[in-house]
């Protein structure tokens, strides 16, 4: 009996969607909400939301007897823009006769392909998010701390957190390469608490309660300088990275 291709594709998609929904929920919780992955499609090529920008220096010291000129503050809006990125998979060849010969149900192939696609899709979402975060933070010199001249230490992470001043307590997570975390271990940072493990993504916690999201995302390693590989480590607050799945994963 020939296995219906439409049914096969539907089963593959159902398994992929169910698997990724479950693992996204676990990942979001384990990462402290610093990286939020979710299945929430939006219309059009962009999602644009406006919000009022915080006004600095609203309270001032005044001279009760003065008559000087005051400089007014302006209420401004800022835009939160999300860009839709298309993703898909190569066509996957499947021979039902192989399963009939071995007396197995061809539906097993749909299940296994769906599970593999879910893992690959989640990794792609994370890599794309990290690529954007590295570019965004890298263009803000005030939020960068260069410790590439020495092996990574917890002191270096603390110096990076200090860039945020009294807002450093808002940091929820460090996103770092596996090479960096191993060097931190070599420098006496010991932590056996493993919160989440998923296809090359590990989440552990530092002494201040910030979690370490360990993944070998391509943009966490930079070999472009010609003087060896430098590793990027991101300190993230809650909802620093939000990735919506567009629910349009096609071949």
What are these regions (language model features)?
Residues 1-83:
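N-terminal "assembly arms/tails" that initiate or stabilize quaternary assembly
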Residues 9, 13, 17, 21, ...:
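Generic detector of well-ordered alpha-helical segments enriched in charged/polar residues
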Residues 32-40, 70, 74-81, 158-163, ...:
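Intrinsically disordered, low-complexity boundary segments flanking structured domains
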Residues 46, 88-90, 172:
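A generic secondary-structure signal marking the coil-to-beta-strand transition
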Residues 75-104:
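Short acidic, glycine/tyrosine-flanked loop/strand segments centered on an H-E-D-like triad
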Residues 96-169:
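Alpha-helical scaffold segments that mediate packing/assembly in large oligomeric complexes
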Residues 162-251:
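Extended oligomerization regions of viral-like shell subunits
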């Amino acid at each position: 009996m020939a296995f219906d291709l439409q049914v096969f594709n539907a089963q593959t998609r159902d398994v992929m969607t169910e698997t990724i929904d479950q693992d996204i929920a676990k990942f979001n919780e384990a990462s402290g909400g610093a990286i939020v992955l979710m299945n929430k499609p939006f219309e059009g090529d962009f999602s644009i939301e406006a919000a009022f920008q915080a006004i600095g220096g609203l309270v001032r010291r005044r001279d009760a007897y003065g008559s000087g000129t005051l400089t007014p503050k302006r209420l401004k809006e800022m835009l939160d823009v999300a860009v839709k990125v298309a993703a898909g998979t190569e066509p996957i060849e499947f021979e039902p006769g192989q399963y009939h010969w071995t007396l197995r149900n061809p539906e097993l192939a749909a299940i296994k392909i769906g599970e593999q696609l879910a893992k690959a899709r989640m990794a792609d979402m994370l890599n794309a998010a990290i690529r954007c975060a590295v570019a965004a933070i890298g263009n803000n010199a005030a939020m960068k701390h260069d410790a590439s001249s020495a092996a990574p230490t917890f002191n270096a992470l603390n110096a990076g957190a200090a860039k945020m001043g009294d807002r450093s307590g808002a940091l929820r997570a460090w996103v770092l390469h596996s090479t960096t975390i191993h060097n931190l271990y070599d420098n006496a940072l010991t932590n056996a608490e493993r919160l989440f493990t998923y296809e090359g993504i590990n989440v552990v916690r530092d002494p201040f309660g910030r979690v370490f999201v360990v993944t070998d995302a391509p943009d966490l390693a930079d070999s472009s300088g010609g003087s060896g590989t430098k590793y990027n480590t991101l300190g993230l607050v809650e909802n620093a990275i939000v990735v919506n799945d567009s629910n349009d994963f096609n071949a």
